[in-house]
From Swiss-Prot:
It comes from Bacillus cereus (strain ATCC 14579 / DSM 31 / CCUG 7414 / JCM 2152 / NBRC 15305 / NCIMB 9373 / NCTC 2599 / NRRL B-3711). PANTHER family: ISOPENTENYL-DIPHOSPHATE DELTA-ISOMERASE (PTHR43665:SF1). The keyword Isomerase applies. Substrate binds at R6, K7, Q152. This is Isopentenyl-diphosphate delta-isomerase. It is an enzyme of class 5 (isomerase). Its cofactor is FMN; NADPH; Mg(2+). Belongs to the IPP isomerase type 2 family. Mg(2+) binds at E153. It is found in: Cytoplasm. It catalyses: isopentenyl diphosphate = dimethylallyl diphosphate.
Length: 349
């Protein structure tokens, strides 16, 4: 019951705390092209995460599950939206259902709604090989997300305090998994050092989960008697984390998430090097406040606007969008210079 109550608290406080931190995309400017030689009607948005082919560079990221009927209904609605737009979708952490079988229905519902969809299972980095297998089987997942959430756990009143052996557990799951593994942050971003460590143990897909979206330190602080307010502004902004990711020069697939709300955010994330982008809190807020049809309409507009932007840039495909010229400026530029990451190649390609 404690875990289920926490799931419901997360939804409540995620909606009430909002997405107030900046994601850094205001520091990214496209170089305008007056002769784009493009046609809106022939723009295509297909992309890939590793070997998984996706019809859109937008997917519905992990949100919830394991909190009884309310979370079942949310996942049911999100699965309907995913089916309508042919989007991939991730579920929230399934540890609740591994601990309490009665919660499994809140995850399994997505396959009932969308039998042929692309779905990602989800567990924390404390998971064992056996738990990873059960989570994948539970929803017949196409991939497994393993989330890294150190700051959330430290801020969570009942959270973990021991983070030893995480990399070794991830390596074991990678070596034994029948589906691809995606390692993701939950809103605090990933450094190039973290990504290199993950590459070294065989990880091939990463969701950088940058600062700018749902702030899980703020969410957990709402549940504390004594706030750990110093964690509320902790992390690496989304735009910065994407560039840190690409600087590793590894054959990784990158997912950009963390405060992405507009088609311009999507376009900038992809142009910086992401293969796809993920929405969570923004979609949840629309669903809970305005309803499912409004969310369906919003995603339609996102795709329309993304194609407008690609047309303006002369990018006929997602791959071409990844090579358009842009300029990195402001706080993002200064951070990257301090980190020894040159951004000049973005403006000269």
């Amino acid at each position: 019951m404690v875990r289920a109550k926490r799931k419901l608290d997360h939804i409540e406080y995620a909606l009430s705390t909002g997405q107030s931190r900046t994601h850094g995309f205001h520091d990214i400017d496209f170089v305008h092209q007056s002769l784009p030689n493009s046609n809106y009607d022939t723009i295509t948005c297909e992309t890939k995460i590793g070997e998984l082919s996706l019809s859109s560079p937008i997917f519905i990221n992990a949100m919830t599950g394991g909190g009884g009927e309310k979370t079942l209904h949310i996942n049911e609605q999100l699965a309907y939206v995913a089916k309508h737009h042919n989007l991939a979708m991730a579920v929230g952490s399934q540890m609740a259902a591994l601990k309490d079988e009665s919660e499994a229905a809140s995850y399994k519902v997505i396959r009932k709604v969308n039998p042929n969809g692309i779905f990602f299972a989800n567990l924390g980095s404390e998971a064992t090989i056996e738990q990873a297998e059960r989570a994948v089987d539970m929803i017949e997942a196409n991939a497994l997300q393993i989330h890294l959430n150190v700051i959330q756990e430290l801020t969570m009143p009942e959270g973990d305090r021991d983070f030893t052996g995480v990399l070794q557990r991830i390596e074991k799951i990678v070596l034994n998994s029948k589906v691809p593994i995606i390692v993701k942050e939950v809103g605090f971003g990933m450094s190039k050092e973290t990504m290199q460590q993950l590459v070294n143990v065989g990880v091939t897909a990463i969701d950088i989960g940058g600062q700018g979206g749902t702030n899980f330190a703020a969410v957990e602080n709402e549940r504390r008697q004594r706030m750990l307010s110093y964690f509320n502004n902790w992390g690496i902004q989304t735009a910065t984390s994407i560039i840190e990711a690409t600087s590793t020069n590894n054959n990784l697939s990158f997912i950009a998430s963390g405060g992405i709300q507009t088609a311009l955010d999507v376009a900038k994330a992809i142009a910086l090097g992401a293969n796809t982008t993920a929405f969570a809190g923004y979609f949840l807020r629309i669903l809970m406040q305005d309803g499912i049809e409004k969310l369906v309409d919003e995603i339609e507009l996102l795709h329309t606007d993304l194609k407008f932007i690609m047309t303006a840039l002369g990018a006929k495909t997602i791959e071409e969008l990844q090579s358009v010229p842009l300029v990195v400026k402001g706080e993002t530029y200064h951070w990257l210079m301090q980190r020894g990451i040159d951004t000049a190649h973005y403006s000269r390609r």
